[in-house]
Amino acid sequence: MAADKPHMNLAVIGHIDHGKSTFVGRLMYDAGAVPAHVIEKYKEEAKQKGKESFAFAWVMDSLKEERERGITIDIAHKRFDTDKYYFTVVDCPGHRDFVKNMITGASQADAAVLVVAAPDGVMAQTKEHIFLSRTLGINQLIVAINKMDAVEYSEKRYKEVVEQVSGILKMIGFKPGDIPFVPTSAFYGDNVVNHSEKTPWYKGVTMMEALNNLKVPEKPSTLPLRIPVEDAYTISGIGTVPVGRVETGTMKKGDKVVFMPGGAAGEVKSIEMHHEEIPQALPGDNIGWNVRGIGKADVRRGDVCGHTDNPPKVADTFVGQIVVLQHPSAITAGYTPVFHAHTSQIACQLIELNKKLDPKSGQVKEENPTFLKAGDAAIVTIKPTKPMVIEPVKEIPQLGRFAIRDMGMTIAAGMCMSVKQK
């Protein structure tokens, strides 16, 4: 049963049309997660639309509109098992305007598979996705050099693409030697579960073996307790019940906790998960909990619960390292977009542009730049317009990452380097 196996969240990233959905469809199909009759139905539908090669991808693209356009939009959660783990696939779309989905999707992932099409090699989004997944704290990567059937399973072409991808990985601090590269054809299933006869020159692992070789990230239960509040309910006979996912630390009945930035504190009376009372909550648990003396007015979405002896940090200002993904013009000091961090969404002002960095190496390119534009990486000083909890990424990574949104798009992704507390 899947519950006995460790669970991993897997992001699938890469440039549009490089075969991500087909790849995920194939993984699930070969892992026995998709009934054969469903695949047959998709094949038939795809054939009628003249897109026969899309059959497996249709397992993932269950949204009608996407089928018509032939692309994947929202993040789809799919599940499959290997011998060792059970995986939830966080399928990250490839279109440019979907970088926000990538930010919310990738940050839930423990590992990523980068899909690069052999005929095209590295494209703009291949780079952006590698970079973003690194920014968002994904440290385990597997690279699938896909569509090998389209280059007649050429070892020479495979090596060229491996070389291209390795170059980018090195620039941002991955060690290419530690990362498995697998030549695949998701459509035909080469090297996904079984070694392919068409690549006799390839002696490495199959995709399934590479997935089994991933390491389970350690649960951050030794870090200070942090539970971002998603919502708070009033339940008759119990009182106010905040709900949220434990990001770090552990919480037991009887613990003294505080909700920041408001500062309301009390003793934990009960903890519930899946409608059952539990004695303690661990990282990853989605819980509801009741705290003595806390009323509906004391707690709201975006607050963070922690122990009173190590409360969540409330920033007067904080220093962030950001990557500007897109902006119609330029960003200057004084810019006040909305910051999305854990469950909070708060307008914050960039009060100072401290340094412009080379996005590839992290080296300082310019001190106190006058503006930032798409593609730039920078260190900036940020002032929230109202009290906000954020933690340095080195101390509590789960509460140190943020996305900057404005004009209906993701402007930048970033992480908090230091906090000046209120």
UniProtKB/Swiss-Prot annotation:
Residues that coordinate or bind GTP: 14-21, 91-95, 146-149
Region ranges (G2): 70-74
Subcellular location: Cytoplasm
Reactions performed catalytically: GTP + H2O = GDP + phosphate + H(+)
Region (G1) residue spans: 14-21
Region (G5): 185-187
Chain sites annotated for binding Mg(2+): 21
CDD domains: EF1_alpha, EF1_alpha_II, EF1_alpha_III
Keyword Magnesium attributed: yes
InterPro entries, per the entry: EFTu-like_2, G_TR_CS, GTP-eEF1A_C, P-loop_NTPase, Small_GTP-bd, T_Tr_GTP-bd_dom, TRAFAC_GTPase_members, Transl_B-barrel_sf
G4: annotated span: 146-149
G3, as annotated region: 91-94
Domain of life per record: Archaea
Keyword terms: Cytoplasm, Elongation factor, GTP-binding, Hydrolase, Magnesium, Metal-binding, Nucleotide-binding, Protein biosynthesis
Domain tr-type G: 5-221
GO molecular function (one): GTPase activity
A GO cellular component entry from the record: cytoplasm
EC number(s) reported in the record: 3.6.5.3
UniProt enzyme class: hydrolase
Record HAMAP family: EF_Tu_A
Family to which the UniProt record says this protein belongs: Belongs to the TRAFAC class translation factor GTPase superfamily. Classic translation factor GTPase family. EF-Tu/EF-1A subfamily.
Function of the protein: GTP hydrolase that promotes the GTP-dependent binding of aminoacyl-tRNA to the A-site of ribosomes during protein biosynthesis.
NCBIfam families found in the cross-reference section: EF-1_alpha, PRK12317.1, small_GTP
Name used for this protein in its record: Elongation factor 1-alpha
Organism annotation: Methanosarcina barkeri (strain Fusaro / DSM 804)
Phylogenetic lineage: Archaea, Methanobacteriati, Methanobacteriota, Stenosarchaea group, Methanomicrobia
